[in-house]
Swiss-Prot record:
BP-aspect Gene Ontology terms: keto-3-deoxy-D-manno-octulosonic acid biosynthetic process
A single cellular component GO annotation: cytoplasm
Reaction catalysis annotation: D-arabinose 5-phosphate + phosphoenolpyruvate + H2O = 3-deoxy-alpha-D-manno-2-octulosonate-8-phosphate + phosphate
Protein name: 2-dehydro-3-deoxyphosphooctonate aldolase
Pathway(s) where this gene product acts: Carbohydrate biosynthesis; 3-deoxy-D-manno-octulosonate biosynthesis; 3-deoxy-D-manno-octulosonate from D-ribulose 5-phosphate: step 2/3; Bacterial outer membrane biogenesis; lipopolysaccharide biosynthesis
Originating organism: Helicobacter acinonychis (strain Sheeba)
Stated family: Belongs to the KdsA family.
Pfam families according to UniProt: DAHP_synth_1 (PF00793)
EC number: 2.5.1.55
Keywords of the record: Cytoplasm, Lipopolysaccharide biosynthesis, Transferase
Length: 276
């Protein structure tokens, strides 16, 4: 896979539900995503979490867990031929998750966790590091460098080119804006793209953390607007959570797009890419 700094031959698309609810639910979403997965202009990855370890409330659904969750992701991989992204929260999960996942994701709250970044970087998986809501875009270069130096001890400074070559990506998902809200500073896309490929997370960027009495809320209607803006600034890919029935999703339903909405958004982003 090649990602160009100025005009992406293939837009990376990472899409799927927030959390694994059931195999039937995963299959239903995977079927709906087939038109996007088969689009020759996209480099598609199916995503889902086996455990949402940072839910606001202890009572909130977390997922099926590591073993059962990975079994279900492997089933999707086998049936549809999709490449897989899943996130890891603890170092011990890495050696198990990498048997299924093509991309291992570092959650935003853990983007400075050296041991976790190093553990993932010792695998052959692409590492997608989410920018913490509390982090400046410039400071994300140090998380990138942790991964790069683990994979190539001769690297002294992170660049887009050496991060691309070593499979180290960053993901923008918004910054804290007071209590219970996020805002996207589009300058961060340009800043971080100086030292790594950048994926824009459109759906988590419209999250309202803790805004619904023990649950996070969100405003999914703004996700396409921000994604189109990100495409105009220049990004290497789109991360978007999708669900057939967002209102009844077990996690982050308020942020998610329906598959047909996602398909329309991706069409817009590809058109915008053609302008530059």
């Amino acid at each position: 896979m090649k990602i160009s700094k100025t005009k992406t031959p293939k837009l990376v698309l990472i899409a799927g539900p927030c959390v694994i609810e059931s195999l039937d639910n995963l299959r239903g979403i995977a079927i709906k995503l087939q038109p996007l997965a088969n689009n020759e202009r996209l480099d598609f990855y199916f995503k889902a979490s086996f455990d949402k370890a940072n839910r606001t409330s202890l009572e909130s659904y977390r997922g099926p867990g590591l073993e059962k969750g990975l079994e279900m992701l492997q089933a999707i991989k086998d049936e549809f031929g999709y490449k897989i992204l899943t996130d890891v929260h603890e170092s011990y999960q890495v050696s198990i998750a990498v048997k299924v996942a093509d991309i291992l994701q570092i959650p935003a709250f853990l983007c400075r966790q050296t041991d976790l970044i190093v553990e993932v970087s010792q695998t052959n998986a692409i590492i997608n590091i989410k920018k913490g809501q509390f982090m400046s875009p410039k400071d994300m270069q140090y998380s990138v460098l942790k991964a790069l130096k683990t994979r190539d001890k001769n690297i002294q400074n992170p660049t887009y080119e050496n991060a691309l070559a070593n499979g180290v990506w960053l993901c923008e998902r918004g910054s804290s804006f007071g209590y219970g809200n996020l805002v996207v500073d589009m300058r961060s896309l340009k800043i971080m793209r100086e030292f790594a490929p950048v994926i824009f997370d459109a759906t988590h960027s419209v999250q309202m953390p803790g805004g619904a009495n023990g649950k996070s809320s969100g405003e999914s209607s703004f996700a396409p607007i921000l994604a189109r803006a990100a495409a105009a600034v220049g990004v290497d890919g789109l991360f978007a959570e999708t669900h057939i029935d967002p209102k009844n999703a077990l996690s982050d339903g308020a942020n998610m797009l329906k598959p047909n909405e996602l398909e329309s958004l991706v069409t817009d982003m590809l058109k915008i890419q053609n302008l530059f």
